[in-house]
Amino acid sequence: MADPATDTPSPQFSRVVADESEVARALTRMAHELLEANHGAENLVLLGIPTRGVPLARRLAALIEKVEGRPVRQGELDITMYRDDLRANPTRNPGRTAIPGSIDDSVVVLVDDVLYSGRTIGAAFDALRDLGRPRAVRLAVLVDRGHRELPIAADTVGRTIQAADDERVAVQLAELDGTDAITITRTGKES
């Protein structure tokens, strides 16, 4: 058995798996895939899940608008009070939910940065149910890293990355971090 007093923590090793141009290409492809799957932008609503899903939804909406020549409704969906770990962390400050009009009979695309366990998306489904009855709900993520705990799959994926449980996949966005990148950091401990 290891002695925590004498064990030194494993150093963190980080590597970039996608740079700014690769992130841009992935988002452009995702925008086209969303348009193809929906047969255009009609009735499409993109809802970003904070934090990084919000700027991703804005970017996808701008890319779709560039192709279609008309604006796409987009907003943000806070899931704070729908998370299944509230008992572990009961003090939470709900964020902002901004829905661009009714979502009834719309095709709602939930947008997030990384799909991992599926729990964030499960909470988003619960939050969405309280807001209306969309015709369909789709999921678009920049990164799918596997290791699901819930039976959830993304409809549109920018990049699939195989990562071990002791690795953290992080998305950096210019709006929040000053640059666009996808990194993997080995933490030395299982999540």
Give the residues covered by each predicted segment.
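PRPP-associated nucleotide enzymes
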Residues: 1-191
